[in-house]
Structures are given as structure tokens and as C-alpha cells.
Regions:
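Hydrophobic ligand-binding cavity/cleft-lining segments
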Residues: 1-46, 163
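Intrinsic-disorder/low-complexity, polar/charged segments enriched in Ser/Thr/Lys/Arg/Asp/Glu/Gln
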Residues: 7-15, 46, 58, 69, ...
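Hydrophobic pocket/interface hotspot
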Residues: 23-27, 59, 74, 85, ...
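Solvent-exposed alpha-helix faces
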Residues: 28-32, 79, 147
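Short beta-edge strand/loop motif at the mouth of beta-sheet-based domains
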Residues: 30-71, 160-163
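Hydrophobic-ligand binding "helix-grip"
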Residues: 35, 49-50, 64-114, 122
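A conserved amphipathic terminal alpha-helix motif
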Residues: 122-163
Length: 163
């Protein structure tokens, strides 16, 4: 009997009208400047979103009082073309160091200029009985996050080129 588990992934893409190096840097080094304030798991909506720029680095938030809450870790760091994050939030969006799904972002040249950012949040079947529910929540959350990101990256690309 084949007991294969159905793989569940969410895929989204968006075009940012800026070079890949700027787009990658904006997603990682400037995440706090564009990350939606509504998307946090710590106790305060006043927080700093941080991606440590290396394999094994943390992906986390730090609130105004200095309390840090982990979201996951960096699994692959390949500027300016690829970032692989380990999402370590369970079905209640609480940090679990023993749980991991993957969020892969690729940054590719768009026809006519700019960068196509493709996001795949995969291994969602690992949520077990909650997989379909969590996939639906993730599917509705990433478009808002990517729109905030693209808007910020677009608005700041000419400023970077001028400096």
C-alpha cells in the first residue's frame, strides 16, 4: 500500500522594478522597514524584524523592550539570487525549534527589467491534521507581505541608485 504524503506548498510571485541586488538586500537587511506590523508573534506590535545574513543565522523579531522571539533560521544565503528560510512556527504560529517548513525566495531578472521575486512556502504537510487550514492562512498572508515588500523596494530603488 502506498502511504505517500501529499506535499502542500504555497507559491507566490511579484515583480519589483529594481535590480536583484537591491531587491535581495531590501528583503533581508531592510526587512524591518517594510514588514507588516500586523504579522508578528511576540507580545508587542512595536518590533524590529531581523534576518541575520548568513547560513545558520536567525530570523526573528525584537520588541521595544528587547525581548526576542524566533521565527526561524537561514538555511541558504545566496545573494542576490536565492534565500532559503526555515519557518519554525507551529500551527498556532508559536515558535517550535523542533519544527520546520521552508520558505524559499528566488530573485530573477524580469523581462523588460526589474526582478521577479518568487516565494515558495513548502513542506506544509508537516502541520499534519492542521495542514490545509494553515496552508490557507499562509496563502492569504504572503500576498500582503510581498505587496508591502515590493512597494517599499520600488519606492527606495531610485534613492539607492542616486546615492
Amino acid at each position: 500500500m502506498d502511504m505517500a504524503v501529499k506535499q502542500i506548498a504555497v507559491r507566490k510571485s511579484i515583480t519589483v522594478y529594481a535590480p536583484a541586488a537591491h531587491v535581495f538586500r531590501t528583503f533581508t537587511a531592510n526587512q524591518n522597514d517594510w514588514w507588516p506590523r500586523s504579522h508578528h508573534i511576540g507580545g508587542s506590535d512595536r518590533f524590529t524584524a531581523i534576518v541575520e545574513p548568513r547560513v545558520g543565522g536567525r530570523w526573528f523579531e525584537r520588541d521595544a523592550e528587547g525581548v526576542e522571539t524566533n521565527w526561524g533560521k537561514v538555511l541558504a544565503w545566496e545573494p542576490p539570487t536565492r534565500l532559503l528560510l526555515g519557518w519554525q512556527l507551529d500551527s498556532r504560529f508559536a515558535y517550535d525549534p523542533n519544527f520546520l517548513t521552508e520558505v524559499e525566495l528566488t530573485f530573477a531578472l524580469a523581462a523588460g527589467g526589474g526582478t521577479i521575486v518568487t516565494l515558495e512556502h513548502r513542506n506544509l504537510e508537516r502541520f499534519g491534521a492542521d495542514a490545509e487550514k494553515v496552508a490557507a492562512e499562509i496563502d492569504s498572508g504572503w500576498p500582503q507581505i510581498l505587496a508591502e515588500f515590493a512597494g517599499y523596494a520600488d519606492a527606495h530603488s531610485s534613492m539607492e541608485a542616486a546615492s
